[in-house]
A protein has these predicted regions:
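Post-Walker A alpha-helix
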Residues: 180-181
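A noncatalytic interaction/capping subdomain that flanks phosphate/NTP-handling catalytic cores
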Residues: 1-173, 186-190, 197-304
Length: 304
């Protein structure tokens, strides 16, 4: 289905997305859809997405941060520039240049706490269809916007265990985040998300993890109060060790979604992680991929 407007609730924030010169493929957001006019004020974010065919790229000026990296699974070079905004209405602007191997020549995003404008210049036939939040700059905006509200995004799997506690497992890709989530599912837990979540301060002073729309597959808008953090690695045997303080903040930060990166946002992210995570039992965990690890984790949390 194609549409000119999408409304979705993500991590308790209502997004209103409007398309100009394009249309949206709504499948990635279908499970997060909300009714029109469901929120206002600080709980609402308005996003405009424009398709700019063969338009010149924005001028790069007053660069705060820049980076070059391989872009996702396409193995293409991408350049990122974090610039000062052209107007006091915006917090900052991010400009992305892509290689010709990709579908996009350049893209720009400018944003504030409650508003964003994304412009995309395509160089191949796209039939004018954009999939919101499968596009890298909108994911970066989602990360930035959550940081402005005391939260952060992190590569992780999260399950809600049988006792209602949310368990977050984080590590680099390929370490076993999805594996351990599915092991817990086999022992009675419910998977909230098995790749990436938003963490925000909870109403009770703790923290809550939220599923978000993903690039490759559908998600449901689930959330859970966090009761344990686990920095995982694969091991010939199961072992677990309690961690506290700065070690926890550093480990969470290393797997958070925060690019493009600069000093001001780094300090804000450190504060958000500290506020959300330092009251939650945290552990390094070596595990072998069988059900025995579930008992190891549950026993560790009983003594935490």
């Amino acid at each position: 289905m194609r549409t000119k407007q999408l409304r979705a609730t993500i991590a308790d924030i209502d997004f209103v997305l409007n398309a100009e010169g394009c249309s949206f493929a709504d499948a990635p957001l279908k499970g997060f859809a909300t009714e029109a006019g469901s929120a206002a004020g600080d709980d609402r974010v308005d996003v405009t997405v424009r398709l700019a065919e063969n338009s010149p790229a924005p001028e790069i000026r007053d660069v705060r941060f820049s980076a070059k990296k391989d872009a996702f699974e396409d193995n293409c070079r991408t350049e990122w520039y974090l610039c000062s905004p052209t107007s006091a209405d915006w917090e900052e602007e991010i400009i992305q240049y892509c290689g010709e191997e990709q579908n996009i020549k350049w893209a720009s995003l400018r944003y504030s706490r409650n508003r964003a404008e994304l412009t995309i210049c395509h160089i191949k036939d796209t039939q004018g269809v954009v999939s919101p939040f499968t596009f890298p700059l909108l994911n970066i905006y989602l990360s930035r916007m959550m940081q402005l509200r005391g939260g952060f995004m992190i590569h992780s799997s999260v399950v809600e265990d049988k006792d209602g506690k949310g368990l977050l497992f984080t590590a680099v890709s390929g370490t076993g985040k999805s594996t351990i989530a599915h092991i817990f599912e086999g022992e009675g837990a419910t998977i909230v998300n098995d790749d990436m979540v938003v963490v925000r301060p909870g109403a009770d002073g703790g923290a809550r993890a939220y599923a978000i729309p993903m690039r490759a597959y559908a998600q449901r808008p689930r959330s859970v109060a966090l009761g344990g953090l686990f920095f995982i690695s694969q091991s010939p045997k199961n072992w677990i060790e309690r961690k506290k303080g700065a070690t926890v903040v550093a480990r969470v930060m290393s797997n958070s979604i925060s690019q493009p990166f600069d000093a001001a946002n780094a300090l804000r992210l450190i504060g958000n992680i500290s506020g959300c995570c330092l009251g939650i039992p945290a552990f390094t965990l070596g595990f072998k991929p069988d059900a025995e690890v579930v008992g190891v984790i549950r026993n560790a949390l009983k003594g935490a």
